[in-house]
């Protein structure tokens, strides 16, 4: 077995004594640092490589901290308008995952980079931690690599904000195929709009 196989086996057994101790110590360290931190190398090299990371120029990894819990509706002093059924503030369920929020925050902070992918790293009672893989689309090492230079195309600017990363597509319900999923494509809103628009074809 190669070294990456051993590393991935370690990460699969997260309840082992070694991993529980490591994760607890690391979590303490992460709590002391800012919410978005650049790393020298990925903490999970096997996972990062599976998701597109390469240890070469132009590739960077950032750790992002996201607060756990539900999303409160951002209304000043809790003043909401409309019918009582739509006046909820606290027990609303956010439609995207914490991982996609982490990708979004990294993408906003680092506007010149492109988000490739991300993965779970750690969590405690208050926060979840993710590592985000980003590339520099202006770097020649990226532009000349046929495996990644697709991301230099301007249509891939801020793909994390438009639900185009792996996690974004998952949150949009685009992982499945077949007749059970045809209402999710091209998007749930587009399908709703098509089904709720009265279209009177002109008689010719």
Swiss-Prot record:
Region (Disordered): 161-204
Gene of this entry: RPL15A
Comp. bias regions, Basic residues: 171-192
Family annotation (InterPro entries): Rbsml_eL15_core_dom_sf, Ribosomal_eL15, Ribosomal_eL15_CS, Ribosomal_uL23/eL15/eS24_sf
Sequence ranges of Polar residues compositional bias: 193-204
Phylogenetic placement of the source organism: Eukaryota, Viridiplantae, Streptophyta, Embryophyta, Tracheophyta
Record-given protein name: Large ribosomal subunit protein eL15z
SUPFAM superfamilies: Ribosomal proteins S24e, L23 and L15e
Keywords, comma-separated and alphabetical: Ribonucleoprotein, Ribosomal protein
Family: Belongs to the eukaryotic ribosomal protein eL15 family.
Highest taxon in the source lineage: Eukaryota
GO MF annotations, alphabetized: mRNA binding; structural constituent of ribosome
Pfam families: Ribosomal_L15e
Presence of the UniProt keyword Ribonucleoprotein in the record: yes
PANTHER family: LARGE RIBOSOMAL SUBUNIT PROTEIN EL15Y-RELATED, RIBOSOMAL PROTEIN L15
Organism: Arabidopsis thaliana (Mouse-ear cress)
GO cellular component: cytosol; cytosolic large ribosomal subunit; cytosolic ribosome; plant-type vacuole
A GO biological-process term: translation
């Amino acid at each position: 077995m190669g070294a990456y196989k051993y590393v991935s086996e370690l990460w699969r057994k997260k309840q082992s004594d070694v991993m529980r101790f490591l994760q607890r110590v690391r979590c303490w360290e992460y709590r002391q640092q800012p919410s978005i931190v650049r790393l020298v190398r990925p903490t999970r090299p096997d996972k990062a490589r599976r998701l597109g990371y390469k240890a070469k120029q132009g590739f960077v990894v950032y750790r992002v901290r996201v607060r756990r819990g539900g999303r409160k509706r951002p209304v000043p002093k809790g003043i909401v308008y409309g019918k009582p059924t739509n006046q909820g503030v606290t027990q609303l369920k956010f439609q995207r995952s914490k991982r996609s929020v982490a990708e979004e925050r990294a993408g906003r902070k680092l506007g010149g980079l492109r988000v490739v992918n991300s993965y779970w790293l750690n969590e405690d009672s208050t926060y979840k931690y993710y590592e985000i893989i980003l590339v520099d689309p202006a770097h020649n090492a990226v532009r000349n690599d046929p495996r990644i230079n697709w991301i230099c195309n301007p249509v891939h600017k801020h793909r994390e904000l438009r639900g185009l990363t792996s996690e974004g597509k998952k949150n949009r319900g685009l992982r499945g195929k077949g007749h059970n999923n045809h209402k999710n494509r091209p998007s749930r809103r587009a399908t709703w709009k098509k089904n709720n628009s009265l279209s009177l074809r002109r008689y010719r």
